[in-house]
Amino acid sequence: MKIQIIAVGTIKENYIKDGIKFYLDKLKKIYDIEIVEIKEEEDPGTPASREKVLETEGERILYKIDRESFVIALAIEGKEVSTEEFASLVKKAFGMGYKKVVFVIGGSLGIWGKVKERADVNISFSKMTFPHQLTRLLLLEQIYYALL
């Protein structure tokens, strides 16, 4: 089983880096897991320019996704899932014969529409908005508990 997390931006805060390392170290003992970071574009401030930023980041994300992968995008407008539902979704993806499950975390502006269309499922951890850097840590924690 291979797990890939495609995330826009880099982690700057040490406390988040430490948490990510904690869960990655645990998961890597059992699973082939990697994080692929996509360059984050600066927010230009205008709606038209923001859409261009989403497109640029989205094209980079799509380039990294294999055709044979099961893709789960984390999007604020996605289906809100519980820990149990998340675990069931991940296990189901591997049970369907997919060799890789790809999770996508967008940047501060979200995820481009075409990436959400490519995803097999769009989920949300909460109706609240979290910094995308913190979402990476939350995702790893949920993956860890889903695959125990």
Curated annotation (Swiss-Prot):
GO terms for molecular function: rRNA (pseudouridine-N3-)-methyltransferase activity. Keywords: Cytoplasm, Methyltransferase, rRNA processing, S-adenosyl-L-methionine, Transferase. It catalyses: pseudouridine(1915) in 23S rRNA + S-adenosyl-L-methionine = N(3)-methylpseudouridine(1915) in 23S rRNA + S-adenosyl-L-homocysteine + H(+). It is an enzyme of class 2 (transferase). S-adenosyl-L-methionine binds at residues 74, 106, 125-130. It comes from the Bacteria. Its main location: cytoplasm. Gene3D superfamilies: 3.40.1280.10. Its EC number is 2.1.1.177. Pfam families: SPOUT_MTase (PF02590). Coiled coil: none annotated. It is found in: Cytoplasm. GO terms for cellular component: cytoplasm. Specifically methylates the pseudouridine at position 1915 (m3Psi1915) in 23S rRNA. Homodimer. Belongs to the RNA methyltransferase RlmH family. This is Ribosomal RNA large subunit methyltransferase H 2. It comes from Caldanaerobacter subterraneus subsp. tengcongensis (strain DSM 15242 / JCM 11007 / NBRC 100824 / MB4) (Thermoanaerobacter tengcongensis). The gene is rlmH2.
